[in-house]
Amino acid sequence: DGCPPHPVPGMHPCMCTNTC
């Protein structure tokens, strides 16, 4: 999906989901 890796499986970093 073009998003950088995230430490929590099934979740995306803020810059991808725009939610923190």
From Swiss-Prot:
Asked if Methyltransferase is a keyword of the record, the answer is no
Q: Hey, what tissues is this thing expressed in?
A: Expressed by the venom duct.
Listed GO molecular functions?
acetylcholine receptor inhibitor activity; ion channel regulator activity; toxin activity
Would the keyword Lipoprotein turn up in this protein's UniProt record?
Answer: no
For this UniProt record, give its keywords in alphabetical order, as a comma-separated list: Acetylcholine receptor inhibiting toxin, Disulfide bond, Ion channel impairing toxin, Neurotoxin, Postsynaptic neurotoxin, Secreted, Toxin
Disulfide bonds, paired cysteine numbers: C3-C16, C14-C20
Q: Where in the cell is it found?
A: Secreted
Gene Ontology cellular component list: extracellular region; host cell postsynaptic membrane
Q: What is known of its domains?
A: The cysteine framework is XIV (C-C-C-C).
The role this protein plays is: Alpha-conotoxins act on postsynaptic membranes, they bind to the nicotinic acetylcholine receptors (nAChR) and thus inhibit them.
Q: To which protein family does this belong?
A: Belongs to the conotoxin A superfamily.
**Name of the molecule in the record:** Alpha-conotoxin-like ts14a
Species, as recorded: Conus tessulatus (Tessellate cone)
